[in-house]
Amino acid sequence: MSGRAQRQHPGRLTKRAEFLAVQRGLKLRGRLFLLELLARGDDDPPRVGITVTKKVGNAVERNRIRRRLREAVRVHAADDMATGTDYVIVGRREILDAPFGALKDELSRRIRGNKPARTG
């Protein structure tokens, strides 16, 4: 084992009601994606949902956008996520043309800069 801290793996948002609940939270619009976040008020690991609307391309393009976002969260942004917080990332078509380094840096920067205040 290395001396690094244990990496926290975010859970997944899977139900429509969970995605809709996060819509009531903070929205951060950007060129590559829309980031919505909502503090749950517990100490459970963060949860992430990734979606791309049908306005964006065809199924192949939407799936590629989802895969790029999922990988950016896995390799870079997961460490920046606050416990007890739900995140929804709505991908945009511009992700297809953006360099992966720029995508993961932008995602990490937005998540790091907007950790919700802890309640209680």
From Swiss-Prot:
Keywords attached to this entry: Endonuclease, Hydrolase, Nuclease, RNA-binding, tRNA processing
SUPFAM superfamilies the UniProt entry points to: Ribosomal protein S5 domain 2-like
Reactions this protein catalyses: Endonucleolytic cleavage of RNA, removing 5'-extranucleotides from tRNA precursor
Pfam family for this entry, one: Ribonuclease_P
Enzyme class label: hydrolase
GO molecular function: 3'-tRNA processing endoribonuclease activity; ribonuclease P activity; tRNA binding
Keyword match Transcription: no
The enzyme's E.C. designation: 3.1.26.5
Cross-referenced InterPro entries: Ribosomal_Su5_D2-typ_SF (IPR020568), Ribsml_uS5_D2-typ_fold_subgr (IPR014721), RNase_P (IPR000100), RNase_P_CS (IPR020539)
PROSITE patterns named among the record's database cross-references: RIBONUCLEASE_P (PS00648)
Gene Ontology, cellular component aspect: ribonuclease P complex
An individual GO BP term: tRNA 5'-leader removal
Oligomeric form and interacting partners: Consists of a catalytic RNA component (M1 or rnpB) and a protein subunit.
PANTHER family to which the protein is assigned, alphabetical: RIBONUCLEASE P PROTEIN COMPONENT
Record function comment: RNaseP catalyzes the removal of the 5'-leader sequence from pre-tRNA to produce the mature 5'-terminus. It can also cleave other RNA substrates such as 4.5S RNA. The protein component plays an auxiliary but essential role in vivo by binding to the 5'-leader sequence and broadening the substrate specificity of the ribozyme.
Family stated for the protein in its record: Belongs to the RnpA family.
Name of the protein in its database record: Ribonuclease P protein component
Species of origin: Chelativorans sp. (strain BNC1)
